[in-house]
Amino acid sequence: MSNDNKRLPIGKDIATRRRVARKARHFRIRKNLRGTAEIPRLVVHRTSRHMHVQVIDDTIGHTLAAASSIEPEVRAMEGDKKARGAKVGELIAERAKAKGIETVKFDRGGYKYHGRVAALADAAREGGLKF
Protein backbone atom coordinates (compact mmCIF):
# COMPACT_ATOMS: atom_id res chain seq x y z
CA MET A 1 0.00 0.00 0.00
CA SER A 2 1.50 3.33 -1.02
CA ASN A 3 1.38 6.53 0.99
CA ASP A 4 0.75 8.70 -2.07
CA ASN A 5 -2.92 9.25 -1.27
CA LYS A 6 -2.45 10.19 2.38
CA ARG A 7 -2.34 13.83 3.36
CA LEU A 8 0.94 15.12 4.67
CA PRO A 9 0.95 16.28 8.29
CA ILE A 10 1.19 20.02 8.87
CA GLY A 11 4.71 21.25 8.28
CA LYS A 12 5.78 18.58 5.86
CA ASP A 13 5.19 20.47 2.63
CA ILE A 14 7.54 23.29 1.69
CA ALA A 15 5.00 26.13 1.67
CA THR A 16 3.79 25.34 5.16
CA ARG A 17 7.33 24.98 6.51
CA ARG A 18 8.28 28.38 5.08
CA ARG A 19 5.15 30.05 6.46
CA VAL A 20 5.65 28.54 9.92
CA ALA A 21 9.35 29.50 9.91
CA ARG A 22 8.49 33.10 8.97
CA LYS A 23 5.93 33.28 11.78
CA ALA A 24 8.53 31.96 14.24
CA ARG A 25 11.04 34.59 13.07
CA HIS A 26 8.39 37.30 13.45
CA PHE A 27 7.60 36.18 17.01
CA ARG A 28 11.31 36.25 17.89
CA ILE A 29 11.60 39.78 16.49
CA ARG A 30 8.42 40.98 18.21
CA LYS A 31 9.62 39.69 21.58
CA ASN A 32 11.95 42.68 21.82
CA LEU A 33 10.24 45.20 19.54
CA ARG A 34 7.41 47.39 20.82
CA GLY A 35 6.15 50.57 19.22
CA THR A 36 5.30 53.57 21.40
CA ALA A 37 3.60 56.88 20.74
CA GLU A 38 7.02 58.56 20.43
CA ILE A 39 8.64 55.83 18.30
CA PRO A 40 5.98 53.64 16.65
CA ARG A 41 6.60 50.37 14.84
CA LEU A 42 6.70 50.24 11.02
CA VAL A 43 5.34 46.78 10.11
CA VAL A 44 5.74 45.19 6.67
CA HIS A 45 3.48 42.45 5.33
CA ARG A 46 4.31 40.89 1.99
CA THR A 47 2.20 38.62 -0.17
CA SER A 48 3.04 37.13 -3.54
CA ARG A 49 1.37 40.08 -5.29
CA HIS A 50 1.17 42.99 -2.84
CA MET A 51 2.84 44.76 0.07
CA HIS A 52 1.15 46.37 3.05
CA VAL A 53 2.85 48.59 5.61
CA GLN A 54 1.50 50.15 8.79
CA VAL A 55 2.82 52.46 11.48
CA ILE A 56 1.51 51.10 14.79
CA ASP A 57 1.50 52.39 18.37
CA ASP A 58 1.55 49.12 20.37
CA THR A 59 0.77 50.77 23.71
CA ILE A 60 -2.80 51.50 22.60
CA GLY A 61 -2.94 49.12 19.64
CA HIS A 62 -3.76 51.76 17.03
CA THR A 63 -2.62 52.07 13.44
CA LEU A 64 -1.34 55.62 12.96
CA ALA A 65 -0.65 55.44 9.20
CA ALA A 66 -0.91 52.81 6.48
CA ALA A 67 -0.07 52.29 2.81
CA SER A 68 -0.46 49.41 0.40
CA SER A 69 0.31 48.39 -3.16
CA ILE A 70 -3.44 47.86 -3.65
CA GLU A 71 -4.01 51.63 -3.72
CA PRO A 72 -4.89 53.04 -7.17
CA GLU A 73 -1.81 55.25 -7.56
CA VAL A 74 0.49 52.27 -6.94
CA ARG A 75 -1.56 49.85 -9.07
CA ALA A 76 -1.39 52.27 -12.02
CA MET A 77 2.42 52.22 -11.93
CA GLU A 78 4.48 50.50 -14.56
CA GLY A 79 7.35 48.36 -13.39
CA ASP A 80 8.10 45.38 -11.22
CA LYS A 81 7.05 44.56 -7.67
CA LYS A 82 10.24 46.06 -6.29
CA ALA A 83 9.38 49.47 -7.80
CA ARG A 84 5.87 49.22 -6.38
CA GLY A 85 7.34 48.40 -2.97
CA ALA A 86 9.49 51.52 -3.20
CA LYS A 87 6.39 53.60 -4.02
CA VAL A 88 4.63 52.16 -0.96
CA GLY A 89 7.68 53.20 1.10
CA GLU A 90 7.40 56.76 -0.23
CA LEU A 91 3.68 56.84 0.59
CA ILE A 92 4.13 55.63 4.17
CA ALA A 93 6.91 58.16 4.78
CA GLU A 94 4.71 60.96 3.46
CA ARG A 95 1.71 59.88 5.58
CA ALA A 96 3.76 59.34 8.73
CA LYS A 97 5.42 62.74 8.43
CA ALA A 98 1.99 64.33 7.94
CA LYS A 99 1.01 62.85 11.33
CA GLY A 100 4.20 64.20 12.93
CA ILE A 101 6.08 60.88 13.04
CA GLU A 102 9.80 61.26 12.32
CA THR A 103 11.33 58.09 13.84
CA VAL A 104 10.09 54.49 13.67
CA LYS A 105 11.23 50.99 14.63
CA PHE A 106 11.38 48.80 11.52
CA ASP A 107 9.61 45.44 11.84
CA ARG A 108 10.38 43.39 8.74
CA GLY A 109 7.77 40.83 9.76
CA GLY A 110 10.11 37.85 9.59
CA TYR A 111 10.87 38.48 5.92
CA LYS A 112 14.45 38.76 4.66
CA TYR A 113 15.73 42.31 4.37
CA HIS A 114 16.09 41.88 0.64
CA GLY A 115 14.29 42.81 -2.57
CA ARG A 116 10.88 44.39 -2.04
CA VAL A 117 11.30 44.74 1.74
CA ALA A 118 14.65 46.51 1.36
CA ALA A 119 13.30 48.73 -1.44
CA LEU A 120 10.37 49.77 0.76
CA ALA A 121 12.69 50.54 3.70
CA ASP A 122 15.13 52.53 1.55
CA ALA A 123 12.31 54.58 0.02
CA ALA A 124 10.86 55.30 3.47
CA ARG A 125 14.30 56.48 4.63
CA GLU A 126 14.64 58.70 1.57
CA GLY A 127 11.16 60.05 2.33
CA GLY A 128 12.42 61.30 5.68
CA LEU A 129 11.70 58.52 8.18
CA LYS A 130 14.50 57.55 10.55
CA PHE A 131 14.90 53.91 11.61
UniProtKB/Swiss-Prot annotation:
GO terms for biological process: translation. Keywords: Ribonucleoprotein, Ribosomal protein, RNA-binding, rRNA-binding. The keyword RNA-binding applies. CDD domains: Ribosomal_L18_L5e. InterPro entries: Ribosomal_uL18_bac-type, Ribosomal_uL18_bac/euk. GO terms for molecular function: 5S rRNA binding; structural constituent of ribosome. It comes from the Bacteria. This is one of the proteins that bind and probably mediate the attachment of the 5S RNA into the large ribosomal subunit, where it forms part of the central protuberance. Part of the 50S ribosomal subunit; part of the 5S rRNA/L5/L18/L25 subcomplex. Contacts the 5S and 23S rRNAs. This is Large ribosomal subunit protein uL18. It comes from Corynebacterium kroppenstedtii (strain DSM 44385 / JCM 11950 / CIP 105744 / CCUG 35717). The lineage of its organism: Bacteria, Bacillati, Actinomycetota, Actinomycetes, Mycobacteriales.
